[in-house]
Amino acid sequence: MTSAEIRQSFLDFFAARGHTVVPSSSLLPDSPGLLFTNAGMNQFVPIFLGDRRPDVSTWAGARPGSDTRATDTQKCIRAGGKHNDLEDVGFDTYHHTMFEMLGNWSFGDYFKKESLEWGWELITGVWGIPARRLFATVYRPGAGEPSELDQEAHAIWTGIFARAGLDPARHIVTGNKKDNFWMMGDTGPCGPCSEIHFNLLPDDDEAAGRRLVNAGNPRCIEIWNHVFIQFNANADGSFSPLAAKHVDTGMGFERVAGIHASTRGFTDFSRDPSNYAADVFAPLFARIAALSRKTYQATVPARREGLTAQEDIDVAFRVLADHARCVSCAIADGILPGNEGRNYVIRRILRRGILYGQKLGLANGFFEQLVDPVVASLGPVFPELGQRRDIIQRVMRGEEESFGRTLERGLQIFARAAAAGGGAIPGAAAFELYDTYGFPLDMTQLLAAERGLAVDTAEFERRMEEQRQRGRAALRKEVVVAATAGETAADLTPTKFLGYTATSAHGRVIDVVESGPDVFLVFDQTPFYAEMGGQAGDAGAALIDGHAYAVVDTVKDKAGRHLHKLGPALPALPPAAGLRGAAATLAVDVPRRRAISRHHSATHLLHWALRKVLGTHVRQAGTHKTPERLRFDFSHFEAVTHAQLQEIERLVNEKVIDNARVETYETEFDKKPEGTLAFFGDKYGRIVRVVDIGGYSRELCGGTHVGTAAEIALVKIVSESAIAAGTRRIEAVAGQAAIDFVAVRESALAAVSAHLSAGPADVARKLETLIAHQRELERQLKSFQQKASAGLADSLAAGATARAGLKFVYAVAAAESPEALRSLGSQVLAKLGEGVVVLGTPFGDKATIVALCSPAAIQAGHQAGKLVAALSAKLGGRGGGKPDYAMGGGRDVAKLAETLTEA
């Protein structure tokens, strides 16, 4: 069987047993707490939690079967966070950053008997894996661990092995919570699991195989895990049965396909198994071999340093094959290389691949050439790869060009640090490589390990923390204070926010906070929005005991209290102790709040339009909304064209005119509408707030918004620029700010129209005519200048003096620029043949000198650099250069003629 046939036979086997074949979900997970989709069950979590009824037959792209049974092959990435295989990839034959997880699921339908018996039927009956080589693990709790022996699974396996003519006592192995009990988290659904292990020793000795189960030996590995979700873990540490029991299984596709290839169809176990033997990697290996003119021989190093030449080559082949698959699939799912979170992980993987490409001698620009073989091998099952091939290649090209500009210099820095001795790369050098040259720490560690060196990670982390502290200090609104000594954030009560429905309210002062020169009031409740999620804090006024206090900003502390910053020109505040408990009337500056809300709602529309025009890979990377403008940072791999910006702006204003309602409501995170955008790294509780504009734009958001889209009035894009590799920034204005922006533009256009004596519609055409005329005049002027310069060169050459076989010209000459003076000097020297030319010209308040020496003049001891240095000094300046050409000058313009005459 080919790898593709193994995959398809798995899906067909379960489809024939009533399972709906669902497409792989995106590598961009729905849960903001996950870096990447890292298991087949991720997309089914809401069903397991009871937040969504089983309805898989209705899912887009599904091959329908039962709603309560599903099967698929899921793209997974494990690189970064808890699951991080990155540093091992390449050095063995079974680690990957990206892999496929084959799986089947039951949602309150069949349970252990069907799951285990079908699994056995597939791997022994359909695929032909020798039954004698298989072992099953069953949960047996250790001291203090939950539940009891999974007697049900044990009995099922006993029957399976007995019917196969095998001794169940030899082939069933028990494991504790670490190996055979699955938990989604500290609380929630959980249950025992049963794994199938495959003995890959050259002989099929049962006792030897049994000893290797769960021993971490690559000659006896787990190939399929069956998880039986039957309990709920409670907060008090107890476990209670679930009303509906589920099955969740997972099988590593590359692992099974690799074993099949390594063992010639599960028949020859003489060779070491390798996932990379699977033919799914063959197109990539062929392309790498063609590019590098080297051959993959499947060697595996015993250690990280002192590799043979062939081991180095084979490690690089495996790294490139794995990383090309990972980065291609990530970009296809909208995860672009970047500087934070999951985007930074993808950038690290890509740069690690580029570094290994250099080890194979591959030229800059090679990585994008690995996309075609990825599409060839994975495109039929993951069609988004073929559909987005061009985007994938363009992103890779830009990343490789960007990193290539600093890679060589960074390698030089590393080489110097390595040569300095001491047994370790200093943390300062590792930080410089990271901060200046874009080397992730693990890349520096990799380079160091190859030389038998360590990296001073403690010093590296210290410098990283210093940088983070500097960044925090630069943020104007980072207010972290405690109310009184001895209190912590946990002791303080968050402020009750009323501002979604009110712009004025009554409250009581509960604290006065002083932070340097700034004074903040804290109330028990407030209509003032505190800066959060990029939205500026509210301003307004607080009336306390008949005194009006201006509130110029509102921020939040760690306890969730709203801190109302008071303006500088205020009535004297009573002592803090006397102020606590005082009644207050709070009023938000409503026009200012409305302006901010317009910009916030406009930001949501802009995000929607960007994804519509540029693609769903666009993701918010940062945002700021003020009364005056909005700023939106987003992931994208190239500059947005003028035509694209026009279309984005048109779509946004089209939706403004359509005047859809802007609805906000709270729901449980796992029950939010499909397609609602959440942002990785943001902290979401169980209850979240959804902002829905017309059903087409849905985001989790805690900010304030307009009631209908038409309240935004108008949106105008002001600028688009790059702020980092893979990250763009758009600045725009909305509402009155947009109207003012248009008015300024119209005023400027009217002024230009008046100067050109042309109507606004004719300005562009009139300018094109004037520019064309100007260019023609410049061409004619340049021609005249060249003729004049040639004549001047003749005149200067004719006045040369001769000495010792050389000709000399020292003169003040007319030239319109230093470049023209140099050109004139070159012309004069060409006419002299062998000699020295020194020319000077005043430009404003500075005299400029150029000197040129022919080869014979240099041979005779004349040097342009020394001449210019001496003459410039006389003019009160300095200069120098090479023996054949130099430029300098000084500010004593009056001495120019005298200086050249003396020379």
Indicate residue ranges for each PLM-predicted region.
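A glycine- and charged-residue-rich anion-binding loop/surface
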Residues: 1-903
